[in-house]
């Protein structure tokens, strides 16, 4: 038994329902992060960039 930790990980019986719920939760977390962090930050940066471009043309 060279890798006891590996054997512990392989011997754990995880139901497919638990794995599916975990995957759905992870995807939900990614979508929430995109909605609350990435989209507003990108929108703000685009707005600042466009505002700066308009001010340079004057």
From Swiss-Prot:
The chain crosses the membrane at residues 27-47. It comes from the Bacteria. Involved in the binding and/or turnover of quinones at the Q(B) site of Photosystem II. Pfam families: PsbX. Keywords: Membrane, Photosynthesis, Photosystem II, Thylakoid, Transmembrane, Transmembrane helix. Its main location: membrane. Belongs to the PsbX family. Type 2 subfamily. This is Photosystem II reaction center X protein. It is found in: Cellular thylakoid membrane. GO terms for biological process: photosynthesis.
């Amino acid at each position: 038994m060279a890798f006891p930790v590996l054997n512990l990980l392989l011997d754990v019986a995880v139901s497919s329902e638990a794995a599916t719920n975990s995957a759905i939760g992870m995807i939900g977390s990614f979508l929430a992060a995109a909605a609350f962090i990435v989209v507003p930050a990108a929108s703000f940066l685009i707005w600042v960039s466009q505002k700066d471009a308009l001010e340079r043309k004057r």
